[in-house]
Amino acid sequence: MTDSWERGKGRRTQPPWSAPNTQAQPGLRLYNSLTRSKELFVPQDGNKVTWYCCGPTVYDASHMGHARSYISFDILRRVLRDYFKYDVFYCMNITDIDDKIIKRARQRHLFQQYRERNPRPSDLLQDVSAALTPFLQRISEANDPDKRQMLERIHGSVSAALLPLQDAVSSNARAEELERLSQELMEAAVDLLSDWLDEKHGAQITDNSIFSQLPKHWESEYHRDMEALNVLPPDVLTRVSEYVPEIVAFVQRIVDNGYGYVSNGSVYFSTAKFHASEKHYYAKLVPEAVGDQKALQEGEGDLSISADRLSEKQSPNDFALWKASKPGEPSWESPWGKGRPGWHIECSAMAGSILGESMDIHGGGFDLRFPHHDNELAQSEAYFDNDHWVRYFLHTGHLTIAGCKMSKSLKNFITIKDALQKNTARQLRLAFLMHAWKDTLDYSSNTMESAVQYEKFMNEFFLNVKDLLRAPTDVTGQFVKWEVPELELNSCFYSKKAAVHEALCDNIDTRTVMEEMRSLVSQCNSYIASRKAAKQPPNRLLLRSVSSYLTAMLKVFGAIEGEEVIGFPIGGSDNSMNLESTVMPYLQVLSQFREGVRQIARQHKVTEVLQLSDLLRDDVLPELGVRLEDHEGLPTVVKLVDRETLLKEKEEKRKAEEEKQRKKEEAARKKQQQEAAKLEKMKVSPSQMFQLETDKYSQFDESGFPTHDTEGKELSKGQSKKLRKLYEAQEKLHKEYLQMAQNGTTG
């Protein structure tokens, strides 16, 4: 044996390696509107991802419909960048030249001028009456029931303000009264007066600055809203007004390539010529919508669907690339005369200028698929002469309000600022994370309550882990032997991480991710409770790993800002970690001192000191954002929480106690009423109880027991048997009453 070992010394080599059995890792798949299915995501240029997102048309306040798209895309962008580690280059536009903007700017300008002229009450009445004629015509022609309802509501408000002013003018009321009623009518009639003034004088406006002031204001408000929602700013922001030369050149090349034609100073895209080309296909996203004139005209804009404009087209399916400006519209020089860009060409030219002939991702709301995005695709592929301007088209789902579409006519139009009055930006984001980004999201009290409870559930876990980690220990003391509970929790932890990764690969399924994270926290809570029940400390390192992972995931989703290692920031401050590390040692000393004082107060039964201790816990410290949790036989838990959250909890506790007291008093009142009713019933002698029911019985025996009904018929044996039971029960009650009266206990 020894000889064989000696002989083989020079020839020994390593044995073959046993390679592990590998399973293919899931790759990221995104739902691509171009195929209406989930496709493996493969960027065109290595790790770089080029992304264009349709931005807002800035003519009014941003609303929850905007939030649906921009929060959802912010989440997707962060996941690609911070989880999958792609190098994302994100471009977004601002539409500041548009029919809606032109019309709104003119109306606002003309109404402001009208208000400044301060028309006499009689002139105002005359003008409102004149404006009502076309307004009533609009109501009669309105096909959309929601729009019709809104117009009728405006008409009702105007009528309600019109009559008092008419009466005041007729009765020669005082000037102050006429002024007040005139202002009320002016406010009620702002919409129909603006329309009427625009129809009369809109064509006379020549100052282009009027059309830039409105979008500048609302763009600024939009950026404030996005910052408040913690939506990342784009890497590049393009404004239509800054890209007019590029748009003109873009249109010219489409014409040169044979897909555009000039008509009466405007330029239109020939959908027929484009679709006839072997290398092109019109309406890739929604081919079944081709020929939908309602959708096409909405895409052209309110100022571009007059009979003369529509007659300029070779086909009703064609759309404007460049619009010859009419009087009262802003204009720019072009080879075809003064005009302005069409809506669809704006995005094509700006995206092409920044991202080139092909991009990885284009994003927008679901309702933009046709005609806007289909027309964008056609224009850009006509310009670049390719068939792959966009590789992946992502569309966020609709947003409804408590099950209904959002509409001013339904009085459920909610701006982002309105929403932030009710919930925090984090709570709104959590609500979005708890729904699939491509599906309809219902913004309702139930939806938001679910998000609030999720936040509270996670926050309590983070606070409990922080408290455990603050328990004093030496360097080696933090490393303890793992028993079965730790091994099981760790196995669950890695299983949940794998499930989270799989869900993110599956079209960034944040809904499933949030549920897996909730389940992981539930497992941790059960583990902590079981260790405490066994008088054993939970494993600090394991819980720190779990909470750090959950915090990192919430950071990826944009639900946590700053450099927080574990949990949500305190008060939303980036300096929350410094705050916690600074004040917590002092709070721990205060907590220990308070606990010592309470023990002495209990021993000596000094209730005043115990009351002061409770006052410190319940009223004083919550005002400073500090929560103390007393546990019998265990050290007091100290938690730093947002002051607003603690005050809200305090208010909810107060309301709950008031409700409990109210129910207690209500129960006592009902009991008193029942006892009083019972006492009144006990007072009635059995010989009288049936004689009072003359609507049922007509004859009685000597004891007052009924023998015949109201028709004079003798009662059957069955009826008599039932009544005898009632008689005997009353006899017993009355006897009890007489005994109580004799004893003087009837109250």
Curated annotation (Swiss-Prot):
Its EC number(s): 6.1.1.16
Cofactor binding remark: Binds 1 zinc ion per subunit.
Keyword Transmembrane: no
Residue positions binding Zn(2+): 54, 347, 372, 376
Compositionally biased intervals (Basic and acidic residues): 651-683
Compositional bias ranges of the Polar residues kind: 15-25
Binding site for L-cysteine: 55, 95, 372
Cofactor: Zn(2+)
Residues covered by region (Disordered): 1-25, 651-722
Motif mapping: 'HIGH' region: 56-66
Catalytic activity: tRNA(Cys) + L-cysteine + ATP = L-cysteinyl-tRNA(Cys) + AMP + diphosphate
Motif 'KMSKS' region location, chain numbering: 405-409
Molecular function GO terms recorded: ATP binding; cysteine-tRNA ligase activity; metal ion binding; tRNA binding
Binding site for ATP: 408
A cellular component annotation (GO) from this entry: cytoplasm
Motif, 'KIIK' region: chain positions: 100-103
Gene Ontology process terms (BP): cysteinyl-tRNA aminoacylation
SUPFAM superfamilies given in the database record: Anticodon-binding domain of a subclass of class I aminoacyl-tRNA synthetases, Nucleotidylyl transferase
Entry keywords, A to Z: Aminoacyl-tRNA synthetase, ATP-binding, Cytoplasm, Ligase, Metal-binding, Nucleotide-binding, Protein biosynthesis, Zinc
Database matches in InterPro entries: Cys-tRNA-ligase, Cys-tRNA/MSH_ligase, Rossmann-like_a/b/a_fold, tRNA-synt_1_cat_dom, tRNAsynth_Ia_anticodon-bd
Cellular localization per UniProt: Cytoplasm
PANTHER family: CYSTEINE--TRNA LIGASE, CYTOPLASMIC (PTHR10890:SF3), CYSTEINYL-TRNA SYNTHETASE (PTHR10890)
Subunit structure, interactors included: Homodimer.
UniProt family annotation: Belongs to the class-I aminoacyl-tRNA synthetase family.
HAMAP family, per the entry: Cys_tRNA_synth (MF_00041)
Name of protein: Cysteine--tRNA ligase, cytoplasmic
Organism: Xenopus tropicalis (Western clawed frog)
